[in-house]
């Protein structure tokens, strides 16, 4: 089968389409014929070697975590799906014609494969960090970097929970944030004053999604380091803020998002799709930032 791999750490240009053996579902897993795969920041961070802790890449590696497709192989112990079912979920090396998923949920009939492929990592991350930061209905949440994949999930889920959201994004993505239900503002110098103008009663909690060095400003706005949480700035703890990195209940988060979609209460827009042969361009676009919604790789 065809799959996207890299044999060395580096820029997006190290990605290649290669012929590899098909994977097979093990115990508690399913294999899907991939229709689409979501692009996440963690994909290019792994490819660039940021997560390798200085160790060399021992062998060629696939890329991609999120995927949507049709089940064509069911592992031992799996009883909630059958061959032919449409699902979306998380696995490894999902930029490929076939991929093995370790966590999945049924794809709602009205949700396209491209849209579904954009759900897994963002919705798991969004629900996890909203729970961890402890923001409650009636409170105000500031989201730094609100227009990307995770931010695009955080905003509507928070709004469904009765939380007011102020989000930062570039000028061109301000209307997009409004469409999600957030009050937009720009990032950069003067952030504290701009947010205070928008939230005279203060900000109750803040999420740093972009990792753009704003932890001190977020702490100033919340008045309490423990009410600031980052998924992108690993130095946040030096300021007393918290960092969240580990997935906890991917299936539960995906099921919640699927149910909200079915009820007409949640969408995660796809900004752009790329064919498998342009996976390098997809990751480069993600790495450049300023994306409004999700980037997705499609598989013929």
Predicted regions and their residues:
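A glycine-/small-residue-rich N-terminal strand-loop-strand element
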Residues: 68-91
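N-terminal glycine-rich beta->alpha transition that marks the start or flank
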Residues: 11-14, 19-68
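Short helix-loop-beta connector
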Residues: 82, 109-112, 134-140
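Glycine-rich phosphate-binding loop and adjacent beta-alpha segment
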Residues: 178, 209-269, 276, 299-300
């Amino acid at each position: 089968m065809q799959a996207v791999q890299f044999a060395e750490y580096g820029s997006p240009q190290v990605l290649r389409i290669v012929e590899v053996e098909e994977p097979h579902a093990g115990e508690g897993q399913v294999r899907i014929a991939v229709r689409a795969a979501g692009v996440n920041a963690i994909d290019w961070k792994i490819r660039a070697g940021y997560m390798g802790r200085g160790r060399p890449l021992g062998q060629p590696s696939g890329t991609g975590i999120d995927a949507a497709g049709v089940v064509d192989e069911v592992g031992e112990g799996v009883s909630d799906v059958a061959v032919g079912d449409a699902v979306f979920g998380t696995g490894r090396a999902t930029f490929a014609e076939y991929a093995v998923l370790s966590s999945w949920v049924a794809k709602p009939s009205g949700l396209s494969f491209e849209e579904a492929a954009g759900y897994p990592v963002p919705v798991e991350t969004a629900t996890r960090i909203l729970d961890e930061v402890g923001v409650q209905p009636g409170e105000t949440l500031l989201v730094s970097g609100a227009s990307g994949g995770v931010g695009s999930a955080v905003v509507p889920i928070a709004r469904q929970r009765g939380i007011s959201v102020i989000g930062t994004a570039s000028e061109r993505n301000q209307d997009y944030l409004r469409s999600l239900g957030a009050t937009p503002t720009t990032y950069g110098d003067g952030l504290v004053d701009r947010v205070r103008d928008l939230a005279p009663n203060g900000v109750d909690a803040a999420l740093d999604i972009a990792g753009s060095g704003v932890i001190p400003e977020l702490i100033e706005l919340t008045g309490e380091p423990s009410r600031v949480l980052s998924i992108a700035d690993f130095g946040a703890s030096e300021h007393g803020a918290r960092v969240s990195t580990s997935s906890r209940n991917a299936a539960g988060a995906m099921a919640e998002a699927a149910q909200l979609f079915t009820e007409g209460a949640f969408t995660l827009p796809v900004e752009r799709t790329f064919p498998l042969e342009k996976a390098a361009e997809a990751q480069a676009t993600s790495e450049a930032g300023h994306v409004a919604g999700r980037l997705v790789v499609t598989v013929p």
